[in-house]
Amino acid sequence: MAKVKIGINGFGRIGRLVARVILQSDDCELVAINDPFITTDYMTYMFKYDSVHGQWKHHELKVKDEKTLLFGERPVTVFGNRNPEEIPWGQTGADYVVESTGVFTDKDKAAAHLKGGAKKVIISAPSKDAPMFVVGVNEHEYKSELNIVSNASCTTNCLAPLAKVINDKFGIVEGLMTTVHSITATQKTVDGPSAKDWRGGRAASFNIIPSSTGAAKAVGKVLPALNGKLTGMSFRVPTVDVSVVDLTVRLEKEATYEQIKAAIKEESEGKMKGILGYTEDDVVSTDFVGDNRSSIFDAKAGICLNGNFVKLVSWYDNEWGYSSRVVDLIRHMSKTTSKLDSVALACVDAVSTLILSSEC
């Protein structure tokens, strides 16, 4: 089977990690990168050395010329266009484009990639109008005619699988979520101007900073049964990677904590294996650096007040786990499109056979 050819727009944290995931896979191929702010030699350096995930050791990486990188013997074309519609994705064969700049997050802006020859665009951020998919939760609802989709946020990818299991088994009346979230590139190293979010302008390296997040509300978009039942907030903390969700919910059906643990463990070993994890170990955040699962339930960290009121805790590598899901979503989209193409081809063959038979 032919590899899925992927391009990346924006070579920041998520762009580079998505590239690492693609380059370590057997069924996907990175064919192009666009970033107007980085030269190929600096791009090589940024990709090779990563303070969190370590040095790249899988292929030799070098600059062939100012428009080509070599990963081993595999060439990757580099563009430097600011306007998405000017990026010639079609020349490289990139059918799927990961939009990871954080700028072009609505459908109209992301659709500009289609003008350059891309067939599908995956936004690596929440979107106000593009359909959102969380692998393990609602990716089966993807239809091949959808050309612009969102992979939601890293926090929604952690929360949604957990919320789905709890709602399916016990029912959620309402709930509040807090994510204790590692710092990201949008924060300040020292106190600086941040007109829209004054607290967000304070130094990330030695403050716990309350912040807003739409991650809990977004769960209602991927799980309509929970629409309006969840909301939440964030605390940004001075760690460089790995975050943790605290979900406190009121249940429809009474349940013991042991029953809740058993339900989550069952799903983590069944339909959601590889997406939802389960641990009873005495873990801390650094134990999950490089974990490619979306959500790892911490059985020892949760508590019950009574049979209807429970606090659940789940960890996630907000960088690597999320980047892994971006590629998984592309795989699913490709398989869905391929199945449709096969059905269409079979229909054409059947019609052709009927026509030939009637002519005879």
UniProtKB/Swiss-Prot annotation:
Active site: 154
A GO MF label: NAD binding
Coiled-coil region: none
InterPro entries recorded: GlycerAld/Erythrose_P_DH, GlycerAld_3-P_DH_AS, GlycerAld_3-P_DH_cat, GlycerAld_3-P_DH_NAD(P)-bd, Glyceraldehyde-3-P_DH_1, NAD(P)-bd_dom_sf
EC class (word): oxidoreductase
Pathway: Carbohydrate degradation; glycolysis; pyruvate from D-glyceraldehyde 3-phosphate: step 1/5
Catalytic activity entry: D-glyceraldehyde 3-phosphate + phosphate + NAD(+) = (2R)-3-phospho-glyceroyl phosphate + NADH + H(+)
Site feature location: Activates thiol group during catalysis: 181
Residues binding D-glyceraldehyde 3-phosphate: 153-155, 184, 213-214, 236
Stretches that traverse the bilayer: none
Binding annotation for NAD(+): 13-14, 35, 82, 318
Keyword tags: Glycolysis, NAD, Oxidoreductase
Quaternary structure annotation from Swiss-Prot or TrEMBL: Homotetramer.
Protein purpose: Key enzyme in glycolysis that catalyzes the first step of the pathway by converting D-glyceraldehyde 3-phosphate (G3P) into 3-phospho-D-glyceroyl phosphate. Essential for the maintenance of cellular ATP levels and carbohydrate metabolism.
Official protein name in the record: Glyceraldehyde-3-phosphate dehydrogenase
